[in-house]
Amino acid sequence: MAKADVIEVEGKVTETLPNAMFKVELENGAEILAHVSGKIRMHYIKILPGDRVKVEMSPYDLTKGRITFRFK
């Protein structure tokens, strides 16, 4: 039930912040704060500024998100 109301968008990482947080600029121009999902953390996937990523956002708070995929 929780996955049904998730908004998925693509964006570009603009800045790295402490505690595995990132500033991500979305395709529509908005900038949000995103953290790394557990699977990315578990597989030691590095995310650097300039990377294109897929972000999941809750419809209740559109200023925060979770990075779920890093494009090659």
Swiss-Prot record:
SUPFAM superfamilies the UniProt entry points to: Nucleic acid-binding proteins
Ranges where the S1-like domain occurs: 1-72
Any one Gene Ontology cellular component term annotated for this protein: cytosol
Homology family: Belongs to the IF-1 family.
Pfam families documented for this protein: eIF-1a
Assembly notes: Component of the 30S ribosomal translation pre-initiation complex which assembles on the 30S ribosome in the order IF-2 and IF-3, IF-1 and N-formylmethionyl-tRNA(fMet); mRNA recruitment can occur at any time during PIC assembly.
Entry keywords, A to Z: Cytoplasm, Initiation factor, Protein biosynthesis, RNA-binding, rRNA-binding
Subcellular location: Cytoplasm
Job of this protein: One of the essential components for the initiation of protein synthesis. Stabilizes the binding of IF-2 and IF-3 on the 30S subunit to which N-formylmethionyl-tRNA(fMet) subsequently binds. Helps modulate mRNA selection, yielding the 30S pre-initiation complex (PIC). Upon addition of the 50S ribosomal subunit IF-1, IF-2 and IF-3 are released leaving the mature 70S translation initiation complex.
Name by which UniProt lists this protein: Translation initiation factor IF-1
The keyword Cytoplasm is annotated on this UniProt entry: yes
Keyword match NADP: no
Matching InterPro entries: NA-bd_OB-fold, RNA-binding_domain_S1_IF1, S1_domain, TIF_IF1
UniProt organism field: Limosilactobacillus reuteri (strain DSM 20016) (Lactobacillus reuteri)
PROSITE patterns, alphabetized: S1_IF1_TYPE
